[in-house]
């Protein structure tokens, strides 16, 4: 079934330039846009940007969670089984940041046990994703080949 974004609460984890561009698009689609960042500031694209320390409580009210944060010692494995357990079972996790931010085994378990509605994954702990990964066969997972940044505008700027 389809996942309608209009009217949903979208959480951007990592509110830098990439996260803010995502927020701009979600806002245009009629979403309530929240943010979580290591260094929260005010930004008109977000209803509010929260500190990382309150991430679990913000996950519990979010319908879609998009990860756009850098990989640091603080963010490595941030989305482990414990963190994923705070998400709604109707929520979608989107990872376009770094694969190691998400514990793939914990995510696979959450998806197979229907603790999450689905996931969109552009990055993985180890790339390319192993051919024997169960993620390939899950109907509630969309996998892209680490190219979420690709667009006609980017392409024309890189290859004039």
Language model features by range: what are they?
Residues 23, 27, 111-112:
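Gly/Ala-rich phosphate-binding loop of Rossmann-like dinucleotide-binding domains
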Residues 37:
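Conserved acidic E/D residue at the C-terminus of a beta-strand in Rossmann-like folds
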Residues 1-9, 21:
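Phosphate-binding beta-alpha-beta segment of Rossmann-like dinucleotide-binding domains, i.e.
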Residues 40-134:
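Rossmann-like adenosine-cofactor binding region
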